[in-house]
Regions:
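Short, intrinsically disordered N-terminal pre-domain segments
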Residues: 1-25, 225-226
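Internal mixed-charge
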Residues: 7, 12, 111-226
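Divalent metal-cofactor coordination and adjacent catalytic microenvironments
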Residues: 34-115, 121, 125-127, 160-176, ...
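Alpha-helix capping and helix-loop boundary segments enriched in small/acidic/polar residues
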Residues: 2, 31-34
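Acidic-enriched, low-complexity/disordered segments with a strong bias for Aspartate over Glutamate
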Residues: 6, 17, 25, 45, ...
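Intrinsically disordered, low-complexity, basic-enriched segments
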Residues: 21-30, 37, 41, 45-49, ...
């Protein structure tokens, strides 16, 4: 698996650089290493936000905290490593797409009843992410014993898929082109790198999506109503 330095050197190689940096934390002293130290975290984090990558998707039981808002029944602490929330689901749901909803697992079963709910099809649980009085982020929802699905802040490059790594190298190269090459040539090179980044991004997203084979479970309403 590629290291952070490997990804940085790959990005520099895309620009025709010698690509021989040995460290960016701390930077070894070269201008290239300093540029990589500045831009690598930005490139990584923005690319992580572009897709629901399977390697960054986690689920955890919500840790209930004090709820001071009457319009929501429950409040849960934001997972420490979460960057954003994907879904709030009942504890027995295998995925976001289907579960057998009952008055116990779906708080709005009666007030928002519909055939899709009775048939066991996925109905997203409403939630809001807000900041509590103490400055901590909390998740507000009506779901009891909620399971939180979220995107984690992934900094370990060994967790990245190979296509994500290649995409990240081109994304980083587009940011390095200006300070490394400079001028109009640097701007033109940045555009070339963005084009190739988008090409590999599509391939990476397709491969990542193919890794998930979730089929919504259909339960006819007369069975669900038993």
């Amino acid at each position: 698996m590629a290291s952070v330095v490997d990804i940085c050197n790959l990005a520099l190689a895309h620009l025709g650089d010698n690509a021989t940096i040995a460290s960016i934390d701390p930077p070894e002293g070269s201008a290239q290493a300093e540029h990589c130290q500045r831009f690598y975290p930005i490139a990584r984090d923005t690319l992580l936000e572009m897709h629901s990558w399977s390697f960054s998707t986690k689920r955890a039981y919500g840790a209930e905290v004090e709820n001071t808002w009457s319009m929501w029944e429950y409040a849960y602490a934001m997972p420490n490593d979460a960057s954003d929330i994907i879904a709030v689901i009942p504890p027995e749901a295998r995925d976001d797409y289907s579960t057998t909803f009952t008055p116990e697992t779906y708080p709005d079963f009666y007030t928002n009843y519909s055939p899709s709910v009775a048939a066991g099809q996925y109905v997203p649980q409403k939630f809001a992410v807000e900041t509590a009085a103490d400055g901590s982020e909390i998740i507000l929802t009506n779901q009891k014993q909620a399971v939180i699905r979220y995107h984690a802040k992934i900094t370990d490059p060994t967790k990245f898929s190979p296509l994500f790594t290649i995409t990240l190298s081109w994304h980083l190269a587009s940011m390095l082109a200006g300070p490394v090459i400079k001028g109009d040539q640097g701007a033109a090179e940045a555009k070339r790198c963005i084009t190739l980044m988008n090409l590999y991004l599509g391939k990476a997203m397709e491969a990542d999506s193919n890794a998930r084979k979730i089929k919504p479970e259909h339960i006819v309403s007369w069975i669900a109503g038993r």
